[in-house]
Design a protein with these regions (language model features):
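Alpha-helical scaffold elements adjacent to nucleotide-binding pockets in ATP/GTP-utilizing enzyme cores
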Residues: 2-9, 32, 41, 45, ...
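Conserved nucleotide-binding/hydrolysis micro-motifs of P-loop NTPases
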Residues: 23-28, 60-65, 140-142, 173-174, ...
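Short, conserved "post-DEAD/DEAH" coupling segment immediately C-terminal to helicase motif II
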Residues: 1-17, 27-28
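Conserved RecA-like P-loop NTPase helicase motor core
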Residues: 165-230
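Conserved C-terminal RecA-like helicase domain
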Residues: 85-88, 96-194
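Interdomain helical connector at the RecA1-RecA2 junction of SF1/SF2 helicase-like NTPases
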Residues: 30-130
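Structural recognition of the conserved hydrophobic beta-strand(s) that form the central parallel beta-sheet
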Residues: 16-22, 192-193
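Short glycine-/polar-rich loops that comprise or flank the Walker A/P-loop
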Residues: 13-17, 35, 48-54, 130, ...
Length: 230
């Protein structure tokens, strides 16, 4: 059944006051509860001291993440297989194949792009600082790649990083809830790489840096991601 109709039928059947509270209002919210009777904006919360403001974003631009990827008819693209850690050449293309910026960020994960971004990040993020960093990846495999590259690039610039300082925290990680507990309460991990697990429902006041290495067209999801550090 349609979830909106399902919720409406329940709210109309029971004789009780219904109060809805949400930080990310969407169309289905007003369909169920009607127009909001009270709103408390992000800016008001910042002024009142309940939230903190964020600085302007630092954008790392490359040719790939601004122009996308385009292969011409007859070319043989090379792809990376994370399961075998090898690069394979595809069959000759019968038609032109183009990935726009959104598709690139979601599905086309290239080693040079990731390494370029990580090389820039390690200049600004101290893996032993009291300030914590949360990185949003496009997929679980992408998260693994980011973790490995972080260790490699810190080593390349002569920064010694404890093994527990950088962790992937996703649903596929071993004992993810314990990792969340450590991230919230202990010094390490200092840098966490996630996909969706830490998007909502987690409050880690020490998070100071948010790094978004994925694309989203969802305003609600973006606000939830931004809320991890505000």
């Amino acid at each position: 059944p349609d979830i909106t109709n399902f919720k409406l039928s329940h709210s109309e059947y029971f004789d009780a006051f219904v109060i809805g509270l949400t930080a990310t209002p969407a169309l289905h919210t007003t369909n169920i509860f009607g127009a909001p009777v009270f709103t408390y904006s992000y800016r008001e919360a910042v002024i009142d001291g309940n939230l903190i403001d964020h600085e302007p974003p630092y954008q790392i631009k490359t040719k790939l993440n601004t122009e996308g990827i385009k292969w011409k008819k007859g070319e043989r693209p090379k792809v990376y297989d994370p399961e075998t850690n090898t690069i394979e050449e595809l069959a000759e293309l019968e038609d032109e194949l183009k990935f726009d910026v959104e598709s690139f960020n979601r599905a086309v994960i290239t080693s040079p792009f990731n390494r370029t971004v990580i090389q820039e990040l390690v200049k600004y993020i101290d893996p032993q600082s009291e300030e914590k960093t949360l990185i949003f990846a496009a997929s679980d495999e992408h998260a693994d790649t980011i973790v490995n590259l972080l260790f490699e690039e810190y080593e390349a610039i002569g920064v010694d990083v404890p093994q527990d300082a950088i962790k992937k925290i996703t649903g596929k990680a071993y004992n993810p809830q314990e990792l969340v507990r450590l991230y919230k309460n202990e010094k390490f991990p200092n840098i966490a790489v996630t996909v969706d697990l830490l998007t909502t429902g987690v409050n880690v006041p020490a998070i100071t840096n948010l790094v978004i290495m994925r694309c989203t067209n969802s305003r609600i999801l973006f606000e939830q991601m931004l809320g991890r550090a505000t």
